[in-house]
Amino acid sequence: IGKALVHSNNPIKIGIILTPDYNPFVLELLEGIQTAQKEFSAFGLEVITKMMTTLEPAEQLSIINELVDMNVSGMAVFPLDDPQIFSRVNHLIENQMAVITFNSRVEGIHHLSFIGQDHYKGGRTAAGLLNKICPPGTQVGVIISSRNLSCHQDRLSGFQDKLAEVDSNFKILD
């Protein structure tokens, strides 16, 4: 495959959409992408990375459309939880574009695959640990960066569900 890519007049382009870089996790992803890009560029593979500046669906939709206009063969998306995003990505998939999603599993997208962890289970684990180290009745503040990312919603749901199960009498502050 490598030789075929090198001799091809049409290099394969892959688009990657990341959320803003204020998250250390995203910075690690970017570092890995840049390393892979250097490694595979000799084989005619072009990686186009676009970093969002907000967590607004309109911005992500614009980036998706920009990558389509650049004739990418496939896309890796850290998807926002928004019906317009679902619709656009599913349209691309229906038109034979390979799409994977990562970090935020979104039920409305029919991706090729998902790469990431079980955020619901992570939230349950955090609540279980909190229950072991804090006395009953503790007031808990929960901070999430955006309701537009299903990973944050899933983690919060797991956290709340586990606290309800253990009947810890914790109070989650708004």
Q: Which residues are covered by each model-predicted region?
A:
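An alpha-beta-alpha
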Residues: I14-L18, I33, A126-D174
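Hydrophobic alpha-helical
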Residues: L67, G74-I93, F159, L173
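Flexible loop/hinge segments that line or gate small-molecule binding clefts
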Residues: D82-K121, K132, Q139
